[in-house]
Design a protein with these regions (language model features):
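Conserved strand-helix element at the start of the C-terminal RecA-like helicase core
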Residues: 57-69, 86, 280, 440-462
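Pre-Walker A (Motif I) flank of P-loop NTPase domains
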Residues: 28-34, 56-57, 133-135, 445-446
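N-terminal cationic and glycine-rich segments that engage phosphates or anionic surfaces
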Residues: 87-432, 436-442, 461, 465, ...
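Conserved helicase ATPase core of P-loop NTP-dependent helicases/translocases
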Residues: 478-500
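Conserved RecA-like helicase motor-core motifs
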Residues: 80-89, 303, 446-448, 460-482
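Short amphipathic alpha-helical segment within the helicase RecA-like ATPase core
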Residues: 69-77, 97-99, 459-463
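Walker A/P-loop
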Residues: 28-50
Length: 689
């Protein structure tokens, strides 16, 4: 099947030229290209057009889960008939195993796995290994971490056909080898049950149950059942059951792995004994022997990932298998916000190695633990044959890789220009800033202020409040959900200014912000380099009156480069608007009000994996409460419904909410949630009478 891009929009501005240049580069097999796109220029739409025109299976890399979820939702809207997958870390919480020699403290691994995200990861692997080429996988850097051997995953797929002869016991053994667990009492995801000649398999990668009906070792029928009702959804002539985990192996390899672990254990014991360290020798013997017995008895043990090299059939030091191994050879990689994502990929391995060195040297793990690791940056580069870096501020690495040839996308569909930049003396920066914020508030606009330290952010917030400004601060010690709430309050006009340090750059979409103020802009360093300054200034690029003020006593090289580049972009944007008769238009976007913390907690429990994307997406679209009110106005008059009718409506709305959440349709999910809460409130009032 081919990629088919569906959108009411057509490429405009300098999008057509950027698309042409990038497509031409991909078809000419250029190893690296860069798309320099300003905030609001439609970079995601350009990515989608490149994918559609090149027809390449594509991996899109993002530097965090929330932005990855936004990209995933957008790509699904562009390619509704193609396979768009989401692959991020499936941990809600993860505390790695560690040993601190200085205090002789051993820390057990502790984790919480999000089953919804695990399902999405498995779906991505299954789709890629199915042979489809119309596949887009949106991923975090989780894609460079180890997974099972893709060949083993493929070999453990179970292909079934109506009329096929198969021994029932053999089929059950194959299901167990594919990591499914027998459960004849309560069928759950990843389980199967066998009753008579009927075998039901609750697939992990989809929300369906596959029913296999046998008749004298012949497959009589293959049906999929609705998980909730148990009713038949569809009949199939053939069906392939994917493994229940991306960490799977064959029985032969598992048997061989146990033998290899025993050999390496003997060598490590002799090594410690040669050093005269009987404590470590006994520790490693005890721990690994127990692990091996667990593997023999139940097929796994705590920390089994530290033995992954044996199960994968890899040699010592050989790189791990990862998601990239599941793609065909001609796949395309798009690195979004590359100035952040590339350094993140580069830095993944260092801390991992240091932590495991302590475990290995002190007899807690075999040296094979070193081979359970993310890809090194060199290994990542070797696997990626063609890459497009996407950023408003590409770093030197990206520019060097593409030899300075950059596709520019500086024109916004709205005609908005990059913000004006002013430099003002820092000696009077606080008083001047206060005056500017008051002007901003008078125009019903908002402001963002970036400081150099967390302490200064808090002190400035207190100062603003004392002078009648509704403000709040954001920095790394502020909880994630609180950050989202604060930004939503800024958009809603409940506060006028947000003061931050380094959390107001990539991915923050705030059309109401007309003023960005950068305090101590002349303090060179990570927070005030060209990339950081340009990204921060860009937060005012979605407002018609956008302006940035840099408070500084001297103009640094980074400041000058930022101003020169911004002026170059403004000149090109103004020239384009003049030539095409375009009048810049203010972006008008609706807002949703976040729930209070207790409601957020309840909603997280209902939505599971996707609460953070839902919360983040609430910054876009019409207010969910307004939508809920409009539903009531359109005919569902809840004030006059009976208790049974209200309960039915609540159940129906909850089901629709969960369906939307699973589909990552965040706005619809939020809409249904608020409507359900309104119904529940009315029901509570009726039942108390």
């Amino acid at each position: 099947m081919l990629f088919e891009l569906k959108s009411p929009f057509k490429p405009m501005g300098d999008q057509p030229e950027a698309i042409r240049q990038l497509v031409e580069g991909v078809n000419d097999h250029l190893p690296a290209q860069t798309l320099l796109g300003v905030t609001g220029s439609g970079k995601t739409f350009t990515m989608a057009n490149v994918i559609a025109e090149t027809q390449r299976p594509t991996l899109i890399l993002s530097h965090n889960k929330t932005l990855a979820a936004q990209l995933y939702a957008e790509m699904r809207s562009f390619f509704p008939d193609n396979a768009v997958e989401y692959y991020v870390s499936y941990y809600d919480y993860f505390q790695p195993e560690a040993y601190l020699p200085s205090t002789d403290t051993y820390i057990e691994k502790d984790l919480s796995i999000n089953m919804e995200l695990d399902q999405l990861r498995l779906s991505a692997v299954n789709t890629l290994l199915s042979g489809r080429r119309d596949v887009v996988v949106v991923s975090s850097v989780s894609c460079i971490y180890g997974m099972g051997n893709p060949q083993d995953f493929h070999d453990n797929m179970i292909s079934l056909k109506v009329g096929q002869m198969i021994d029932k016991d053999d089929l059950l053994r194959r299901l167990i080898n594919a990591q499914y667990t027998r459960n004849d009492i309560a069928l759950q995801r990843g389980n199967f049950q066998a009753k008579g000649e009927t075998i039901d398999v609750f697939l992990v990668s989809t929300d369906i149950i596959l029913r296999i009906v046998l008749c004298f070792d012949e497959i009589e029928s293959l049906e999929t059942l609705d998980v909730t009702t148990g009713h038949m959804v569809a009949e199939y002539d053939e069906y392939t059951i994917p493994p229940a985990s991306i960490f799977t192996t064959t029985k032969e390899r598992a048997d061989r792995a146990v033998d290899e672990i025993a050999i390496d254990l003997g060598e490590q014991i002799r090594f410690f004994e040669s050093l005269g360290d009987e404590v470590k020798a006994e520790r490693i013997k005890e721990r690994v022997t127990y692990d091996v017995e667990m593997i023999k008895e139940v097929g796994y043990c705590t920390g089994i990932e530290n033995y992954s090299r044996y199960f994968d059939g890899r040699k010592p030091g050989e790189r791990p298998f990862c998601l990239l191994d599941c793609f065909p050879d001609d796949f395309l990689v798009i690195v979004d916000e590359s100035h952040v994502t590339v350094p993140q990929i580069r830095g993944m391995g260092g801390n991992d190695r240091t932590r495991k060195t302590n475990l290995v040297e002190n007899g807690f793990r075999l040296p094979s633990a070193f081979d359970n690791r993310p890809l090194s940056f060199d290994e990542f580069e070797a696997l990626v044959k063609q890459v497009i870096f996407v950023s408003a501020t590409p770093a030197n690495y990206e520019l060097q890789r593409c030899e300075g040839i950059v596709a520019e996308q500086l024109i916004r569909p709205t005609g908005l220009l990059d913000p004006l930049i002013e430099v003002r003396p820092s000696v009077t920066q606080i008083d001047d800033l206060l005056e500017e914020i008051h002007k901003c508030v008078e125009n019903d606009d908002r402001a963002i202020v970036t400081t150099f330290t967390k302490r200064l952010a808090e002190e400035l917030d207190e100062y603003m409040r004392e002078h009648g400004v509704r403000s709040s601060y954001i920095h790394s010690e502020v909880d994630t959900l609180d950050r989202v709430r604060i930004l939503d309050e800024l958009r809603a006009g409940e506060i006028d200014v947000v003061i931050g340090v380094n959390l107001l750059r990539e991915g923050i979409d705030l059309p109401e912000v007309s003023l960005v103020a950068i305090l101590d802009a002349d303090k060179e360093g990570f927070l005030r380099n060209e990339t950081s300054l340009t990204q921060t200034v860009g937060r005012a690029a979605r407002n018609l009156n956008g302006k940035a003020i840099m408070y500084a006593d001297t103009i640094t090289k980074s400041m000058q480069r930022t101003m020169d580049e911004t002026e170059r972009r403004r000149a090109k944007q103004m020239r384009y608007n003049l030539e095409h008769g375009i009048t810049p238009k203010q972006i008008v976007k609706g807002r949703n009000t976040l729930l209070d913390n207790e409601q957020l907690k309840e909603t997280r429990e209902m939505f599971g994996a996707v609460i953070e994307p839902i919360v983040d997406k609430q910054k876009i679209g019409t207010s969910a409460k307004q939508k809920s009110l409009s539903i009531v106005a359109d005919g569902t008059t809840i004030d006059y419904q009976s208790v049974p009718d209200l309960q039915k409506e609540i159940d129906k709305t909850r089901e629709a909410m969960l369906t939307a959440a699973k589909a990552l349709d965040f706005l619809e999910a939020a809409h249904k949630r608020d409507y359900m809460l309104m119904l529940q409130e009315r029901l509570d009032k009726l039942t108390k009478k």
